[in-house]
Structure formats: structure tokens, C-alpha cells
Amino acid sequence: MRVVMLGYQTWGHRTLQALLDSDHEVVLVVTHPKSEHAYEKIWDDNVAELAEKHDVPVLLRNRPDDDELLAAVADARPDIIVANNWRTWLPPELFDLPPHGTLNIHDSLLPSYAGFSPIIWALLNGEERVGVTAHRMNTELDAGDVLVQRSVPVGPTDTATDLFHRTVDLIAPIVRESLDLIASGRDAGQWVAQDRARASFFHKRSAEDGRIDWSWPAERLERLVRAQSDPYPNAYAFHRGQRLRIVSAAVSQGCYGGTPGRIFIREGDGVVVVAGAESWSGRSRGLLVRRVRTDDGTEYAATDWFRTMGGYLTSRP
């Protein structure tokens, strides 16, 4: 089949590479210009460079709705459009243009976690599995019928970085399987409508989303630290007015009472910070902070940074 690919960052790069390695012909690539957004500067393998290396025409767009782009896609005569990590809405005159429409590759187990940063949100919410879905694009974002879906388990110490690597490796086989089904006509009867009653949709992550709220239970704070693992912007709080990024943490073994954010006691290789809206009861676990990092990039063992107990980690300076 003749394929037009729309994609960005490593997700789009993996998709394009899978298409180039297949029996299908990539006739045009559309990708976004480079961005200074923190979450778009990581996992930033360049789609345009890969396309140009293989002599595939490339168009750069923030939004794919101008007449020049629509004409270029029509002139390419695609049988299908394949999209992955396209960051803006696609109009129907584009996604319905090819005979087989548009196949979107999304890194969640749809209908859950449509939208942005699905792996981070899923980890934060304690999901047991994450994955990748190939679905038909329609007028509602990430809501079309599903053709192929694959998942991987979330381990108790997995970080968002671990899960990124595990799920990005699912892209190529999912792209190959989906296109082979469509090209051969074996996709008939295989498309499954999403259960919209189970759907959830999430916004882009920003610096505010990494700010620690010490009224959260320690279990959720520990997942936040893992969800904001390097190279993502780390979860952070403030100590004596200075921002402190929490690089490594766990849930404390003991239960500790007091005011959320109190730097309380050493436990094992870390320092326990009181956490949870019910911490006044003395029955809540604390967040065992193991490693911290200052804004200049210097990393410390928590036991070295917090030389004495007492004082507070706060949400604001």
C-alpha cells in the first residue's frame, strides 16, 4: 500500500522505521517542527531526518489543515495514512481522504488514557498494565474502532522510563500486523468499537503536575516519583525555599504521624517525610526519600542532604 505517515518524536520515528522496513511504500511524511516544550525535548528522535535519509518528501506543520498540505496528501494518492504522536487535531477531510482512512497508533490501552502522556498518568494511577493501540481515526480524539492492541505489565518498581522503552518496542510489530491485516482484507470483522463508558482523556503534563502535594498518600507520591523519572522533569518540593527534586523514593516501612511534609526520621537508607491527609492519626505510611537533586543538577543521598531531622518539605517556596 501507499502510505502517508504523520508523526513526531521517537514514537513517530519508530512508526516510520517500521513502515520503511515493510513491503509498503511511504510516499509522504508530515511531522512537527522542533519544540522547546520540556516533554517534547525528550524521546526526540527526528522523524524528518529519517524520512530525508530515505528520500521521502517531508512537510513540517504545527497543524495539518492548510490547503497546501491537503493538496500534497491528495497528490501522494495514499491508500492509508498512519499517525503516531501527532499533537494536534486532524480534520476529517484529511483523515478520511485515503480509501482505508487513517490508522492511529496510541500508547495506551484505549479507551483508557486517551490524550497526552498516557504512560505517566497510568503509572501515577497505579494501573497494572500499559500498552499500545492501533485504531481507526474518527472525529473524536483517540476514540475510533480498535484493530490491534498489545500490553505489558507494570512492575512494582517500574518507572515511566522503563515503561516507555517497553511500550515503544511494541510499535513496529503493531504497525506491521495492522497494515498486513488491512492490505490483505483480513481486517474485516476485526475492528472493535471502544466502550465509551470506560473512556478517559488526559491533558499534557507540565511543571505544575510534578509539584508534590504532601496530603497525598505515600503510595501515590511514590508512584509520582517513578512517573517523573529521568529524563522526565522530576517530582519536586521545596526545602528552606530551595526547589528539591525527588529522584528516588519508596513507601516507608513504619507508620508515622504528624503534619504532612514534616521531615521526620531516618529509616534504612532514606529519610521519611510525613504524608497523607490522615497522617494526624499516626496510621499512615510516610514517603521514604532516598535521593534528591538541586536545580544545579547536583544529586545527594537524602541522608546527606537532611543532616538533621525537623523542618518541612513544602509545595511552594
Predicted regions and their residues:
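Short beta->alpha connector loops
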Residues: 8-11, 62-65, 86-88, 229, ...
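Internal alpha/beta domain cores that form substrate/cofactor-binding pockets in large enzymes
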Residues: 2-4, 25-30, 37, 54-76, ...
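Acyl-group handling in specialized metabolite and lipid biosynthesis
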Residues: 203-216
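An anion-binding loop in the catalytic cleft
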Residues: 213-317
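Donor/substrate-binding cores of folate-linked one-carbon enzymes
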Residues: 22, 80-201
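N-terminal Rossmann-like dinucleotide-binding module
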Residues: 1-42
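A residue-level signal for conserved active-site and pocket-lining positions in enzyme catalytic cores
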Residues: 7, 29, 51, 81, ...
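Structural motif corresponding to alpha-helix initiation and N-cap regions
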Residues: 13, 41-44, 66-70, 88, ...
